[in-house]
Amino acid sequence: MSEGGGQVSCIFAAPTRLCRWPALIECGVNLTQPLCEWMIQVARDRTLSLAWEVASLLTLSSSEVGLEGVGTIWPSSYSSEESSRNGAEQGRQLSIEGPFQGQNCPSHPAAALPLPMRGESQATSCQV
């Protein structure tokens, strides 16, 4: 195969190792800048394609994945009556749709929840 002046003399078995020297030596690749840019673009396109596949799975309802009757749990912000009076604490609760509709998860004081580490989201656990 010839692409932009570069030549690939074999089939890559590990595409994630394309830009590492061991893979280049094993596969005998003569890379030029256009070929490298083309490979990066192909990798980007594949990554975006996979991201869209995952995103579409996340938007499925419980009935579409065979979990009828389980219901859907949505996070929602709230401020308890006591917190509203003193303005000190704010927490989160879960609003529940489905067979558990009308039941709320127990609220936790904000101080009792561990602070999320950088890059993590804070989750509220609930057992109904």
Swiss-Prot record:
Keywords: Cytoplasm, Nucleus. GO terms for biological process: positive regulation of mRNA splicing, via spliceosome. One of its GO terms (cellular component) is perinuclear region of cytoplasm. It is found in: Cytoplasm; Nucleus. Highest expression in placenta, muscle, fetal brain, and adult brain, with lower expression in heart, kidney, stomach, testis, and adrenal gland. In the central nervous system, highest expression is in temporal lobe, hypothalamus, medulla and spinal cord, with lower expression in other brain regions. Residues 77-128 are annotated as: Disordered. Disulfide bonds: none annotated. Was called 'saitohin' in honor of the late Tsuanao Saitoh and his laboratory. Interacts with PRDX6. This is Saitohin. The lineage of its organism: Eukaryota, Metazoa, Chordata, Craniata, Vertebrata.
